[in-house]
């Protein structure tokens, strides 16, 4: 088997492949609603004890975000108390419970197929449980990979988590399309005509009564696989040292790095870890500010305004088949995520973030000045795609890399939790504000604002974010002690 300085590359790769399944589930769970929401809307419009308004539909479509915020906020406490590995096992169990419960919210208690307010509440509880799993995985998966990877390839390996997120979103788009098949056209037609009851005996009826259940239920396959496989990987060496299990830590390090390198890395870890945890501001305020602002900028640059509403945007531009453009954009996103994976250790984190910020600014400003001009709709489409792919080789993967490695060992669990919680909060702010802002202020104002934020993000990275390329996680403790 191929080795890395006496360690097993195959062993390291197998660990990372299992860990990034958490990223795939992150993408899968957040995107599955895109195909299911029309059928779900039509199903609950058949309720007789309440009116399924736009408010209820908006809440149901985004209820998982509540769980994401809760899960990310709890991730630090759990990652410290239970460990990185057991926290990921818990996330896998939550993904599975959510998929099963969302598929069959009646769960042998409520009448099957009878839409009412109680069923809607139960369905949203299951979606929130899945969101908690997403929140835990979004914080702990990159942390786990960052703590187990050798420093020379850490950025590349953590970047695979972002690839898995985008791949999970792409997979569920195809799964949803496969499940709906020929049912999709009559479904959209029925919902679009303001249908208030289930239409029996039509293709739309199957999608309304059953199709959305299959979509949510399909997540049980990767969720079950992740929950089982994560039990087979080791705990991270950094966490093992923090809880006094030096021998176990050395064995894990030896299998990854070889015996000689393992002893050196273990000694370095022990020099910077004198206790399990320290107070969050032990290394000064700037350490936390940098991590939190990385998360805030990743969302404030407005990427989810494109990822969540791409079909709406392309349709507003005047394109006939917005779904095809959305899928094409998704394939491009996957390809440009690979750019980051294979260049992050050569070019460094900061150059990619700055280049991506400027590319996004150019794309956003391009959209601002071409949107709604029929003669320039092709240029507008190119601008949207430039905006999107610039994120995919920069802020998409690199933000996760930096959050996983910029904090010192003894505060990483709590600090990552704070940073990722801010990420989900701003995800919600951007996602819920885009449509009202675009409708009231116009697309020119909205995308000009995103462009300005992108420029501010580039300045922030240039001036305040440390370059972590080639540095060990223990170097971060020494760096922030000097900066304090």
Say what each PLM segment does.
Residues 1-248, 254, 271-484:
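Alpha-helical transmembrane bundle of multi-pass membrane proteins
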């Amino acid at each position: 088997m191929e080795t890395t300085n006496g360690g097993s590359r195959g062993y390291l790769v197998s660990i990372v492949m299992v860990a990034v399944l958490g990223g795939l589930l992150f993408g899968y769970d957040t995107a599955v609603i895109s195909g299911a929401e029309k059928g779900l809307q039509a199903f609950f419009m058949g309720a007789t004890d309440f009116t399924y308004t736009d408010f209820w539909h908006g809440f149901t479509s985004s209820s998982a975000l509540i769980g994401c915020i809760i899960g990310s906020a709890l991730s630090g406490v759990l990652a410290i108390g239970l460990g990185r590995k057991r926290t990921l096992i818990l996330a896998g169990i939550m993904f599975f419970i959510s998929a099963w419960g969302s598929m069959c919210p009646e769960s042998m208690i409520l009448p099957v197929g009878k839409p009412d307010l109680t069923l809607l509440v139960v369905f949203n509880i299951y979606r929130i449980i899945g969101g908690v799993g997403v929140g835990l995985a979004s914080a702990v998966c990159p942390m786990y990979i960052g703590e187990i990877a050798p420093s020379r390839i850490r950025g590349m390996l953590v970047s695979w988590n972002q690839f898995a997120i985008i791949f999970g979103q792409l997979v569920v788009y195809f799964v949803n399309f496969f499940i709906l098949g020929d049912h999709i056209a009559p479904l959209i037609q029925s919902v679009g005509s303001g249908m208030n009851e289930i239409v029996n005996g039509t293709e739309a009826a199957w999608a309304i009564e059953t199709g959305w259940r299959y979509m949510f239920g399909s997540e049980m396959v990767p969720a079950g696989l992740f929950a089982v496989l994560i039990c087979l990987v080791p705990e991270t060496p950094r966490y093992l040292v923090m809880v006094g299990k030096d021998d176990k830590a050395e064995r894990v390090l030896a299998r990854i790095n070889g015996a000689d390198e393992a002893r050196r890395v273990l000694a370095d870890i022990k020099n910077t870890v004198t206790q399990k945890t320290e107070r969050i501001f032990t290394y000064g305020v700037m350490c936390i500010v940098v991590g939190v602002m990385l998360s805030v900028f990743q969302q404030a640059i407005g990427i989810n305004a494109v990822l969540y509403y791409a079909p709406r945007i392309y349709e507003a531009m005047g394109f006939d088949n917005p779904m095809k453009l959305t899928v094409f954009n998704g394939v491009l996103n996957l390809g440009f995520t690979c750019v980051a994976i294979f260049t992050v250790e050569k070019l460094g984190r900061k150059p990619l973030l700055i280049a991506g910020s400027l590319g996004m600014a150019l794309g956003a400003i391009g959209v601002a000045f071409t949107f709604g001009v029929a003669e320039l709709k092709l240029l507008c489409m190119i601008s949207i795609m430039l905006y999107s792919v610039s994120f995919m080789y920069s802020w998409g993967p690199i933000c996760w890399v930096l959050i996983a490695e910029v904090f010192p060992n003894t505060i990483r669990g709590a600090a990552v939790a704070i940073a990722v919680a801010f990420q989900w909060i701003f995800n919600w702010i951007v996602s819920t504000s885009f449509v009202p802002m675009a409708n009231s202020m116009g697309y020119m104002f909205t995308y000009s604002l995103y462009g300005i934020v992108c420029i501010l993000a580039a300045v922030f990275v240039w001036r305040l974010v440390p370059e972590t390329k080639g540095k060990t996680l223990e170097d971060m403790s020494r760096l922030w002690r000097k900066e304090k």
